[in-house]
């Protein structure tokens, strides 16, 4: 479930990933002096603490190339790349490219420590964020195999299994996580998503309500609740939940896309397009937002505004084929999807 991934993508990269009790001895890097290694890692950590990810990546890339067999070097390279990818002013395509490089770095680190549960879990989350779902599943499975007592690892593996359509195994893992973490909203939110995938939106609404009761101020769960209500045939309730939020929150992609979907469910396609247009205007460097707006305006029958949004996307770096696809949108496609 993307909601939970969004909460933890940075947190997991900060987990201690040194050798655990079940880890094999890491491959040595005989060409790199210990003092040089420690100095490089201190420099990278210092740059990250000072919010200078570009400088951190520069040092980390050199370290990783000089010590390809050292897990610490590969892991901190991945961590620096994640920090760079999460910079708010980075264009969306650049962010995707950097996150893909981070996933590669975490793959290399995880291969050097196959039984390091924390590292495998972190590699899974980064792979998921980079939209490399098969790799993510493999890492989640490795983390859970290394530490089957961890409810967190069961939760993430369960979410991955749900996404792959393995409903029975997903339910087993998610219910185990729920029993182990009764005060956490995350397993309940994941079970709500599983119910929705299984075609039972009413059961999903019940479960997401339980999750929200444990975290009533969570914006992510509020959006998930709105989605469940819309899918259960109550788009008015979905809008009531989301339009009450502050405008900057409503303009964020997850929220604006759900608002647009609710408007479409009500037959208000121009309102849907306007919602996505406002979101795009709030982040002019994000061409994906602009293309969503262009597609929505096409579906609303406003080719002029669609072209304006498409031009904005092109200026932000959108690939030409993506722009053409947005301008070919038909009423069969839902704005914000």
Identify the role of each PLM range.
Residues 66, 112, 146, 179-180, ...:
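Structural marker of alpha-solenoid helical repeat scaffolds
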Residues 18-100, 104, 335:
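N-terminal leader/linker segments that initiate helical-solenoid repeat arrays
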């Amino acid at each position: 479930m993307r909601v939970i991934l969004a909460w933890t993508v940075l947190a997991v990269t900060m987990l201690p990933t040194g050798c655990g009790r079940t880890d094999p001895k890491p491959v040595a890097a005989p060409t790199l002096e210990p003092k040089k290694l420690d100095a490089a890692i201190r420099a990278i950590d210092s740059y990250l603490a000072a919010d200078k990810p570009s400088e951190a990546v520069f040092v980390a890339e050199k370290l990783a190339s000089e010590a390809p067999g050292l897990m610490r070097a590969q892991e901190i390279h991945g961590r620096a790349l994640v920090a760079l990818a999460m910079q708010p002013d980075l264009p969306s395509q650049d962010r995707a490219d950097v996150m893909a490089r981070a996933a590669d770095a975490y793959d290399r680190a995880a291969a050097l420590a196959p039984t390091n549960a924390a590292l495998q879990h972190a590699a899974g989350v980064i792979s998921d964020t980079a939209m490399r779902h098969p790799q993510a599943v493999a890492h989640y499975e490795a983390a859970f195999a290394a530490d089957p007592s961890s409810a967190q690892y069961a939760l993430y593996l369960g979410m991955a299994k749900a996404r792959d359509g393995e409903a029975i195994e997903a339910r087993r893992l998610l219910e185990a996580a729920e029993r182990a973490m009764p005060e956490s909203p995350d397993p309940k939110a994941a079970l709500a998503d599983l119910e929705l995938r299984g075609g039972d939106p009413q059961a999903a609404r019940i479960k997401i309500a339980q999750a929200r009761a444990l975290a009533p101020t969570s914006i992510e769960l509020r959006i998930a609740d709105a989605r469940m209500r819309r899918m259960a045939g109550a788009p008015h309730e979905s809008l009531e939940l989301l339009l009450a939020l502050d405008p900057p929150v409503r303009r964020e992609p997850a929220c604006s896309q759900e608002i647009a979907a609710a408007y479409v469910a009500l037959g208000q396609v121009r309102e849907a397009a306007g919602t996505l247009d406002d979101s795009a205007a709030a982040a002019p460097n994000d061409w994906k937002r602009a293309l969503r707006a262009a597609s929505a305006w096409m579906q609303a029958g406003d080719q002029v505004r669609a072209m304006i949004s498409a031009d904005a996307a092109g200026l932000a770096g959108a690939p030409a084929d993506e722009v053409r696809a947005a301008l070919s949108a038909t009423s069969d496609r839902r704005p914000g999807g």
